[in-house]
Regions:
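Hydrophobic alpha-helical membrane segments, chiefly transmembrane helices and signal peptide h-regions
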Residues: 17-24
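All-alpha RGS (Regulator of G-protein Signaling) helical domain and cognate RGS-like helical scaffolds
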Residues: 31-225
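C-terminal motif of bacterial Sec signal peptides marking the signal peptidase cleavage site
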Residues: 25-29
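Bacterial N-terminal signal peptides that target proteins for export
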Residues: 3-16
Length: 225
């Protein structure tokens, strides 16, 4: 038997086996990387902590606006206020439904709420509905209460646009900003015409207000679930 030929054949066979083994390990590793990348992409597509905070904070904020609008539909003294209240109620109820859908998707993906970074006093949630029910003149009181409420929603929308990642939440934020910007301008115009000047709350907030906030992993002080 030719020992040299046998040794060479054994060497070649061994190297081929090692090559197949290495290739298999490499393919497996690539598969793991692809899986991890896929999971990461899916998470990004669903949204991040800012998206979750945006819908968590905006949903009760919208409900508060709808409550105010319902009072205005009954007590409004001028057609402008009654029509505006009806529009707010219809639009924001529809947006609440959209936010609930977004929240369900984020919750299913395990996304936890971060913080929008907006001070509590700028969130527009300190509305006194009992005071509004007895206000006189009602229309002026309604405008003076709804404008800061809208300002808060616009601030939240700007944070979502700056730091959120959900395409659907961003579309909603743009929609909210556009609608409530128009409404603030219309309310101040009406107040100036009927009551001698715009609301002391001011006008549309600047875009760069409160676009900060914690990162995606920063938890809100509220437990949004």
């Amino acid at each position: 038997m030719d020992i040299t030929k046998h040794t060479r054949a054994l060497f070649v066979t061994t190297m081929l086996a090692l090559g197949i083994l290495v290739a298999g390990v490499a393919i497996g590793a690539c598969g793991d990387d692809d899986g991890a990348a896929g999971e990461g992409a899916a998470q990004t597509a669903v949204g991040n902590g800012i998206d979750r905070a945006f819908v968590a904070d905006m949903t009760p904020h919208h409900r508060s606006a709808v409550q105010m609008a319902k009072i205005a539909e009954r007590r409004g003294q001028r057609r402008f206020v009654k029509d505006l209240a009806s529009d707010i109620s219809r639009t924001q109820n529809a947006e609440i439904t959209t936010m609930q859908r977004i929240a369900s998707r984020l919750d299913a993906a395990g996304v936890k709420a971060a913080s929008l970074g907006i001070p509590e006093h700028q969130m527009g949630m300190d509305t006194d509905l009992s005071k509004l029910r007895t206000a006189d003149p009602f229309d002026r009181a309604f405008i003076d209460m709804m404008i800061p409420h809208h300002q808060a929603a616009i601030r939240m929308g700007h944070v979502e646009l700056a730091k959120g990642s959900s395409a659907e939440a961003k579309r909603l934020a743009k929609q909210i900003i556009a609608a409530q910007t128009r409404e603030i301008e219309a309310m101040n115009k009406h107040r100036s015409e009927e009551f001698g000047g715009p609301s002391p709350a001011g006008g549309v907030p600047a875009q760069d207000e409160n676009e900060g906030g914690e990162g995606d992993d920063g938890m809100s002080s509220k437990d949004h679930g």
